[in-house]
């Protein structure tokens, strides 16, 4: 792919991800090459961020699938997407002198990055910490462990869809009223740690 075409394609994906971040209450942090990073539960604290981050991850993959179908019709290349999500403690703040940047630091950021790197294209790969907070509402799939530096073995799970009993559509992407009711209860039991979705194409 020509550089100009690649930049245009990345812009199309990242513009959509920006829209999804706003829709799901996530805070965009940065893009690094073809990677997109955002956080939930910061800078304004809330208790729904693990659920919101998984929703955004599923929505990102749905968009990537849609783009592939559209571009396949014209035999154009598309991007495959890996999404990694982790919930854990971080430090956050604004840094810089001429270009102010809101950013986060900590082991949780590194774990989210490892989850993305060890993810599978087309899937949402989450940590045990995130899985614990969303498993009542989403269909999940255990997928083994990876070795995380200074953390030992890190369990990973795929988040596949909303559970059928809480879904308003066949694909498990639209929540129904029962989901929203349960969401409040699940969220109130969640910690205040932020959730970090990281994606790369």
What are these regions (language model features)?
Residues 73, 95-105:
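Short, surface-exposed loop/helix-turn segments at secondary-structure junctions
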Residues 24-32, 63-84, 145-146:
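Catalytic core regions of nucleotide second-messenger enzymes
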Residues 1-55:
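Catalytic NTP-binding/metal-coordinating core of nucleotidyl cyclase/transferase enzymes
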Residues 60-63, 67-70, 97, 118-122, ...:
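Conserved, well-folded catalytic cores of nucleic-acid-processing
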């Amino acid at each position: 792919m020509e550089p100009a075409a690649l930049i245009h394609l990345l812009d199309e994906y990242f513009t959509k991800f920006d829209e999804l971040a706003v829709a799901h209450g996530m805070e965009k942090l940065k893009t690094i090459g073809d990677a997109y990073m955002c956080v939930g539960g910061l800078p304004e604290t809330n208790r729904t961020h693990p659920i919101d981050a998984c929703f955004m991850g599923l929505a990102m993959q749905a968009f990537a699938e849609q783009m592939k179908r559209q571009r396949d019709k014209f035999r154009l290349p598309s991007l495959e997407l890996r999404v990694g999500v982790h919930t854990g403690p971080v430090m956050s703040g604004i840094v810089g002198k001429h270009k102010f940047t809101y950013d986060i630091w900590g082991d949780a950021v590194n774990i989210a990055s490892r989850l993305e790197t060890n993810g599978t294209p087309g899937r949402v790969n989450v940590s045990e910490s995130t899985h614990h907070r969303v498993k009542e509402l989403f269909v999940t799939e255990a997928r083994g462990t990876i070795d995380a530096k200074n953390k030992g073995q890190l369990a990973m799970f795929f988040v596949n869809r909303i559970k059928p009993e809480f879904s308003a559509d066949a694909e498990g992407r639209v929540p129904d009223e029962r989901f929203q009711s349960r969401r409040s209860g699940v969220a109130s039991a969640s910690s205040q740690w932020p959730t970090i979705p990281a994606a790369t194409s």
